[in-house]
Amino acid sequence: MSKRPSYAPPPTPAPATQMPSTPGFVGYNPYSHLAYNNYRLGGNPGTNSRVTASSGITIPKPPKPPDKPLMPYMRYSRKVWDQVKASNPDLKLWEIGKIIGGMWRDLTDEEKQEYLNEYEAEKIEYNESMKAYHNSPAYLAYINAKSRAEAALEEESRQRQSRMEKGEPYMSIQPAEDPDDYDDGFSMKHTATARFQRNHRLISEILSESVVPDVRSVVTTARMQVLKRQVQSLMVHQRKLEAELLQIEERHQEKKRKFLESTDSFNNELKRLCGLKVEVDMEKIAAEIAQAEEQARKRQEEREKEAAEQAERSQSSIVPEEEQAANKGEEKKDDENIPMETEETHLEETTESQQNGEEGTSTPEDKESGQEGVDSMAEEGTSDSNTGSESNSATVEEPPTDPIPEDEKKE
């Protein structure tokens, strides 16, 4: 059996007019693979632009350049990687890288400077090595070979373009050289049958489910152990999540129960208060308001009557008091007019006798004291008369009377 072909997409089939009339060709089989139908673009060999090796032109590979210097962080990571990996064997690669990144950030500037100095020194060496590399004979030979190959490819592309402009066929199909096909005297019918069976056999192999296993799907023992640890950690995490879900569900049920209890208690209290509510009769309230207004009006009328009666009683009591005061004033006036004459005559006699008796013995101080006593008595008499006149001024005005000293009254 021939080698299994690559999975290259098939090109668009050529029209039937361009199919060659070679012996052994039985129509166009759309299921045939391209690797078993030798086709060339442009009609002659050396013009296959899909693979440069088919035309005999190969672009050489450049020589290996010097390695670039490692960055300071990569130097530090390479230095402490084994230590961190040994202290944390269960962690993943990205977790170890995260730890090393934190350690690098925690370093001081002096500690980082060591790695920076190494990087700068290697960088200088790298620049010198690159200069020597670019001037090396191998690199110069690579440049020359590359330029020649590119020129040949450009020439080939120009030739292909010219052939396409002249109308030459874009694609021609030639029979493939298959070791299964051998000419042992069979007719064209047998050859076509063999080709048909071969093509179907190849198609069945291509479309079958049995493929070469991928290298990445091969699991090693170390990988299995890592996967087992990951499975265990995932199971532990799953159990934690389930426990948290149970706790959340319990708290939710507890809150729900409290809400239901509070709702029931509120409904019961509402029913009790609704049963205790008082029905308001607006007609009864209006009747009570009217009755209260009537009582208030009656009390107001009674107070007004009492005030009017008190005013009448006060007026009736004022009239006899005025009459009594007027009578008393007239009697006093009569009594004062009668003794006025006798008192005047007696006063003159007493004053003369006193003057005669006191001319030899009296002192100026005694005279002054006597005169002050007379004046004070006169003032008292006037004040008494004024009080009497003020008490009776509402009804009768009494005529002014002469003041009488108190000594004369005593005599």
Swiss-Prot record:
There is a cross-link at K92 (Glycyl lysine isopeptide (Lys-Gly) (interchain with G-Cter in SUMO1)). Residues 66-134 bind DNA. The keyword RNA-binding does not apply. This is SWI/SNF-related matrix-associated actin-dependent regulator of chromatin subfamily E member 1. Residues 46-57, 353-363, 383-395 have a biased composition (Polar residues). It comes from the Eukaryota. The keyword DNA-binding applies. GO terms for molecular function: chromatin binding; DNA binding; N-acetyltransferase activity; nuclear receptor binding; RNA binding; transcription coactivator activity. It is found in: Nucleus. The HMG domain is essential for CD4 silencing and CD8 activation; mutation of this domain blocks thymus development. It comes from Homo sapiens (Human). Component of the multiprotein chromatin-remodeling complexes SWI/SNF: SWI/SNF-A (BAF), SWI/SNF-B (PBAF) and related complexes. The canonical complex contains a catalytic subunit (either SMARCA4/BRG1/BAF190A or SMARCA2/BRM/BAF190B), and at least SMARCE1, ACTL6A/BAF53, SMARCC1/BAF155, SMARCC2/BAF170, and SMARCB1/SNF5/BAF47. Other subunits specific to each of the complexes may also be present permitting several possible combinations developmentally and tissue specific. Residues 220-319 form a coiled coil. The modification Omega-N-methylarginine is found at R4, R40. One of its GO terms (cellular component) is chromatin. Residues 1-23, 42-70, 153-175, 296-411 are annotated as: Disordered. Ubiquitinated by TRIP12, leading to its degradation by the proteasome. Ubiquitination is prevented upon interaction between TRIP12 and SMARCC1. InterPro entries: HMG_box_dom, HMG_box_dom_sf. Involved in transcriptional activation and repression of select genes by chromatin remodeling (alteration of DNA-nucleosome topology). Component of SWI/SNF chromatin remodeling complexes that carry out key enzymatic activities, changing chromatin structure by altering DNA-histone contacts within a nucleosome in an ATP-dependent manner. Belongs to the neural progenitors-specific chromatin remodeling complex (npBAF complex) and the neuron-specific chromatin remodeling complex (nBAF complex). There is a cross-link at K3, K92, K131, K146, K166, K277 (Glycyl lysine isopeptide (Lys-Gly) (interchain with G-Cter in SUMO2)). Keywords: Chromatin regulator, Coiled coil, Disease variant, DNA-binding, Intellectual disability, Isopeptide bond, Methylation, Neurogenesis, Nucleus, Phosphoprotein, Ubl conjugation. GO terms for biological process: chromatin remodeling; negative regulation of DNA-templated transcription; neurogenesis; nucleosome disassembly; positive regulation of cell differentiation; positive regulation of double-strand break repair; positive regulation of myoblast differentiation; positive regulation of stem cell population maintenance.
